[in-house]
Amino acid sequence: MKKAKKEKKEKIIKPDGPINFNRSIMAAFEKQSRGKICPLCETKFSLASYKSHMNTCNVADDDEEIEVIATYTRDEAILMRAGPEIILGDASFSDKSENPTKRRKTDEREVPSEDDIVPEVPGPSGIVKNHEMPSESLDVTEISENIEKVIKKSPEWINHRRRSSRLLQNSQKDQADNANKEDPVKKETATISEVLQAIERFEQRVSGPEQTWPYYIKITIKIMKRVISTEKFDGTFYADDFWLPSDIITFYRFVELLSEGAKCLLVRLFIRKPAWYNLEKLEQKYPEIPNIKEAVSELAKGHFIDDDSSMKTLDEALQISDVVALKNVTKKFKLDGTKNRQELIQSLRKFAQSQQSIFGGTGNVEKSILKSLKQELGPCVRVRGGFVDLFKCLFTIYCPVTTNSANVIDNPSTTNVYQDLLYLMLSVANGTVQFPAPNPCPIIASFYKNRNMLQDYMISKSLEIAIVSQMSNGNLDAALDLAIDAKEFIEQMSDDDKRYYESLEIHERKFTSIWVFTRCCGHASSILERQKKYGMAVEWQKDLLITNKDIQSYCIDSRGIWWDRMLLNLDSHLKEKKECAKMIQIALQDPSILEKELLMIQDRALKLKEMPADFVTPINIGNPEKKTITANVITKSLGDGRINRFMIRDHETDDDVECSVEEVTRRHYLENEGFSTGVHDEGSTWHTLFGLFFYDVIFATDESVESTWLSELQDCPSDLSNTLYSKRKEKFEDRFVWLEEAEQELIEENIRKIWDLKHNETNRECSWKQFPMGAEDCVSFFQCIPRPALILILRRLAENYRNSRSGFPDLTLWNPETKRVAVVEVKGPGDRLSTKQRLWLAIFADSGIRAEVCHVAAQNSRLLV
């Protein structure tokens, strides 16, 4: 058996017969020795040297038998035989990964003509994608010209300058002439100087009275001009060395090359939520845009937008599909179409995931549904993320205060910052809105040394907005993951950048990436508390407050809140009383803690038995005066979250009407306490007096505070917080001396003067509507306040604005005849005084002004919840 296997193996290895001589190695040696004769110089060469000789051999100049039409190297001849090149154009918008560069059978990569390539407009990341377009039929001359372009750029052309025929010379001359006539559409590079020249030409075109360009186009270009032409603090500009080359060419193309319709559509898409939009609906929504289909084609060709060929996922299509399209698609796949939109989306999504192909995947089913949805939707477009990011950078540099992501936290209803900014600029241009900021503003935000710093700040803002959005939607795990990303950004930040950010003034640090990332870490502790992971929350809070030295100089306004939350977690949730007492003693040494948080920490310390016996309270305030009144209440829930509804009698109609608890109290004091005027202002009347007396100090625009005005749209200087007093100390003190010594009539005249000059202006301090009778109403209020009390209150605002800008009592009441004034904090059922309110009530009481807490109880016998 073994012998048979061995014979079988030998049979397989053994050759079938004798080797043919032509296939033998001897035949190869003989072929090499014979060589080959050159047909041009008739010289014999070995096969090894024949090919290289043919690349250099020329016909003699006096040869009468041969006329050379054109000469090519071997590689050039291969390109000739390959046919016309594949031209990369603008008709396709798919990514390189989906249309890879093709190769010939010779494995030579096709080289596209430079003049036929329109490069992608990259985003801030600088990533450029090429897109492939099917080539059209070319005649012989075009083929020859295309190949000549390739030859001219090849190494062989440079190293071996062959004699050209007249045909080739003429072709090169035509190519040079065409190059001298630059096609602006194919312009691939630009400078900031060229962008400014293009802006000047645009301004000349739209300056005529017959021009009707939309305001948002003119304002967008105005923003661009101001950003790239305004001098920074250090004397430099946002010039060519700051921007990427792709950024500058995008600016140039937007201003110079795009048509009016394309500009309008692009800006409209930019200021809207970045998503897919149906072209038909865009036509209906923006009828003022001329030839919107041509605009779409132009923008797609210029790589500013994507068409629906870039819509790759089912979720993208489902998100923009209306009920009609969804029903038609569900009917096509034999699903139940008698549902609402959300149910139809879920049904299609579930169907796509449940139907497996023969290979076990669901991709083919999803693609079929996606294809059907695209057919139903028709043409769709989406502005490219790179363009959106770049223009957000422009708007951020122009007005960092308005585009600050902290505004989303303070006002969650703020959904479209950039659209609001454009409309606000229109209002300023029309004169319907006035701000105290200089217009035009001579200074621009200068916190970003390079493009990467600006990009990091943009990332941090987007990250914070995403965290807040996920938290509001209840997606706490996703929000926590984003907060962890923020912490990693801080850890990976270079030491040079950290030192630079720390060298900035406090009001400038707010517009840097490390400040926003630090605030995102604060969101993480809030998320963990909502998830009842108190131990992890404490670890994050300790890192923010104690451990991580790199972030101690940021989010100073929030440090007191973080201390209070950490102590609450240790005391109430984790029951670690000793650790809480230890942390309290560390917290009291933190100079950045505001007075209101300090009082909260003090209250907790007084309740802890573990605190040392010699503990000294840092703040000593008395208890405010209390008053209790009753009012009629209807306990009824109408779906708005309120249960207790206060009712009062309207004397004009003799009907019972619903009102707020503050209105109940205000009426009580006007009818029963001897006051003739009262407003529910929460301190705005006092802030108005502060703004009137110190207007030229707070809103000064001289060189010493010039860096606090970064845009024409600011309603206050950017340092109306920590450094307000320190930067203007001398001027504040001079004004306080004047208030102490000036005659009553002179001060009243000053109030009237400032009121007449500025009452149409919108600024952070003055609430003109609180005095409906104008300046005289304000003067009558001033006459009721004792001068020493007024100076004490205004000094507290000036010296510690960050600590005292809020917390004022709800009601301010006065009587010009009796010269009496009072402040009242109103508390309904179940309400408690905050530490800010306790502090202000104590300040008013100490200054001699009547300050009370008024509790409103139910008229009926039922206790209110």
Curated annotation (Swiss-Prot):
Keywords: DNA damage, DNA repair, Hydrolase, Magnesium, Manganese, Metal-binding, Nuclease, Nucleus, Zinc, Zinc-finger
Zinc finger (UBZ4-type) boundaries: 35-62
Record Pfam families: FAN1_HTH, FAN1_TPR, VRR_NUC
Binding site for Mn(2+) 1: D810, E825, V826
Location of region: Disordered: 90-140, 162-187
Localization (cell): Nucleus
Catalytic activity: Hydrolytically removes 5'-nucleotides successively from the 3'-hydroxy termini of 3'-hydroxy-terminated oligonucleotides
Residue stretches of biased makeup (Basic and acidic residues): 93-112, 174-187
Disruption phenotype: No visible phenotype in normal conditions. Strong increase of embryonic lethality following cisplatin, nitrogen mustard or mitomycin-C (MMC) treatment.
Residue intervals of the VRR-NUC domain: 744-857
EC number: 3.1.4.1
PANTHER family: FANCONI-ASSOCIATED NUCLEASE 1
Physiological role: Nuclease required for the repair of DNA interstrand cross-links (ICL). Acts as a 5'-3' exonuclease that anchors at a cut end of DNA and cleaves DNA successively at every third nucleotide, allowing to excise an ICL from one strand through flanking incisions.
Protein name: Fanconi-associated nuclease 1 homolog
